[in-house]
């Protein structure tokens, strides 16, 4: 057994690459290319105040509760109770549901560029009805495949991650180097300011979406026990992974800015246009349809993998009595069919915003902002909960601990993550000046109503719980404060029984006692 255990241990660089693969996506590069050289500042800033804190805090929490299920529900619930734990995992599930239309919009645009006519491709990519049709067809196809429980989906996803993300990212950077080295004129002003113009407040708004680029790093915390000497090596893996991620994002963004003028940058199309322009420059336009297929394949493979994934967490919690039996139904393959169908209905309704918003780009941006807002609420709970547990569960074993002694480093790391998340949360409500989002009323209505409804829903569901919702076959470990209450109650019962026995023995020794004598007082 020792050899088996040892054989599955991850190396520092292996874990770092796993973290990079989980986070890096090229679809967000055009949003930051709008900022030119200062985009590097945003990437570095978000990495310091969000990416690294998320990775380290999640690692400590995951290691603390490695033998207990629930994920973020467990982490937040241990600190603030079941109600807020349910809110956290509900937000995580809904956020992923809203994410699907945005990532599939990018996939639809990629598919539109398979043709050889730039004019036709760009017109098709901008067509709202085309994007709506592609999003719905691909999503429901992915849902159908997930319900079938096909094992080959995982293999497709692994290939898709390499073909649709890593290879295109490297190719984009190589093309930029070739372009500049051969005398190509850069459209990005590298003499500009590294630090953005903070006096222009709405310039920060679009950049707040960069936090979503790094979202999901908390998932890497589950591997904290799979690495040798986690206290020393896990932080190394985090910092190496963060450095590689930032380098890919910065150089990828620069590569787009070099070939596309800032005024022509489009959030959904510019990545494909950038590749098109580079391929024309090196006289290899025939590669454009191939890279479009590769990018689309990467998107579709990711959706196939994750369409059922995030719903598994809410499904497990639901079986513990937090969701009605309707949501606990599975099919013959053991897949949570009703949750997937409800998820699909939500994706369909959200996708209909294509018809309301003035453009595909504005639809993409408003859903991205709503996704950021919901995810950030969960992160605010996670960061503050981690600090709170340092005092509420002082003696709990921490196989991986931020700081060897005291709580100062946790306050620094967790506090940095909390403040960064709070700043991004506030900025995300403001419409970006760089994108025509149509009516500001629609913008604020979608974001505010969306947040209120999604946050209120789990509290309403929690208040409506019934004993019949609990699946008798499920085994969900109690929270530490529930165990303490049970232990205290048991101790009180044992103490009471001991006192009662002692009293009876004393009474018997003294002789018969009147039947009217009251029983010993029970202390709580």
Model-derived features: positions:
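C-terminal membrane-solvent junction of multi-pass transporters and transport-like membrane proteins
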Residues: 6, 130, 156-159, 329-333, ...
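Membrane-interface loop-to-helix entry segments
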Residues: 130-182, 215, 238-243, 368, ...
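TM-loop-TM module centered on a large, flexible mid-protein loop between adjacent transmembrane helices
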Residues: 74-75, 81, 113-122, 237-307, ...
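Loop-to-transmembrane helix boundary motifs in multi-pass membrane proteins
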Residues: 6-15, 97, 128-136, 228-232, ...
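Helix-loop-helix junctions that connect adjacent transmembrane segments
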Residues: 5-8, 40-41, 119-130, 159-292
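Membrane-interface "cap" regions at the ends of multi-pass membrane proteins
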Residues: 1-59, 65-69, 190-191, 404, ...
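Hydrophobic transmembrane alpha-helices that form the core helical bundles
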Residues: 34, 52-64, 68-139, 143-147, ...
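Transmembrane helix-boundary motif of multi-pass solute transporters/channels
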Residues: 2-109, 211-212, 217-220, 227, ...
């Amino acid at each position: 057994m020792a050899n088996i255990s040892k054989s599955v241990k991850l190396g520092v660089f292996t874990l770092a690459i796993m973290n990079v693969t989980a986070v890096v996506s090229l679809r967000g590069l055009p949003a930051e290319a709008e900022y030119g050289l200062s985009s590097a500042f945003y990437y570095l800033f978000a990495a310091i105040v969000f990416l690294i804190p998320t990775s380290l805090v999640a690692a400590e929490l995951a290691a603390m509760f490695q033998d207990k299920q629930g994920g973020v529900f467990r982490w937040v619930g241990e600190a603030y109770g079941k109600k807020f734990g349910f809110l956290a995992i509900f937000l995580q599930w809904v956020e992923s549901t809203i994410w699907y239309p945005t990532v599939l919009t990018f996939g639809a645009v990629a598919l539109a560029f398979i043709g050889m006519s730039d004019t036709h491709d760009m017109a098709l990519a901008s067509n709202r009805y085309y994007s709506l049709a592609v999003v719905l067809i691909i999503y429901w196809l992915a849902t159908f495949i997930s319900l079938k429980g096909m094992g080959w989906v995982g293999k497709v996803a692994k290939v898709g991650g390499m073909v649709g993300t890593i290879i295109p990212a490297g190719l984009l950077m190589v093309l930029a180097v070739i372009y500049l080295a051969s005398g190509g004129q850069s459209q990005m002003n590298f003499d500009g300011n590294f630090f953005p113009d903070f006096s222009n407040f709405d310039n920060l708004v679009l950049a707040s979406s960069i936090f979503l680029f790094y979202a999901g790093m908390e998932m890497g915390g589950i591997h904290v026990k799979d690495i040798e000497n986690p206290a020393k090596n896990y932080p190394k893996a985090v910092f190496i992974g963060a450095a590689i991620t930032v380098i890919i994002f910065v150089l990828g963004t620069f590569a787009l800015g070099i070939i596309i003028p800032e005024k022509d940058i489009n959030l959904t199309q510019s990545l494909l246009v950038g590749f098109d322009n580079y391929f024309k420059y090196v006289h290899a336009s025939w590669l454009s349809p191939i890279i479009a297929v590769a990018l689309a394949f990467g998107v579709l493979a990711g959706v196939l993998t994750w369409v059922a994934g995030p719903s598994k967490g809410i499904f497990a919690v639901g079986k513990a009595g937090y969701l009605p039996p309707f949501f606990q139904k599975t099919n013959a393959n053991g897949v949570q069919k009703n949750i997937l169908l409800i998820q699909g209905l939500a994706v369909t309704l959200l996708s209909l915003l294509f018809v309301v918003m003035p453009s595909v780009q504005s639809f993409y941006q408003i859903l991205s902002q709503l996704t950021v807002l919901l995810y950030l609420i969960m992160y605010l709970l996670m960061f503050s909960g981690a600090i709170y547990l340092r005092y509420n569960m002082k003696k709990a074993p921490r196989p991986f601990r931020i700081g060897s002694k005291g709580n100062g480093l946790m306050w620094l790391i967790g506090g940095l993550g909390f403040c960064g998340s709070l700043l991004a949360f506030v900025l995300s409500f403001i419409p970006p000046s760089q994108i025509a989002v149509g009516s500001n009323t629609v913008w604020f209505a979608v974001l505010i109503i969306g947040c209120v409804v999604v946050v209120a829903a789990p509290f309403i569901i929690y208040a409506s719980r019934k004993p019949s919702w609990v699946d008798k076959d499920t085994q969900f470990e109690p929270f530490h404060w529930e165990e303490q209450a049970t232990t205290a109650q048991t101790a009180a019962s044992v103490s009471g029984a001991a006192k009662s026995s002692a009293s009876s023995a004393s009474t018997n020794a003294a002789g018969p006692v009147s039947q009217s004598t009251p029983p010993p007082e029970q202390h709580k």
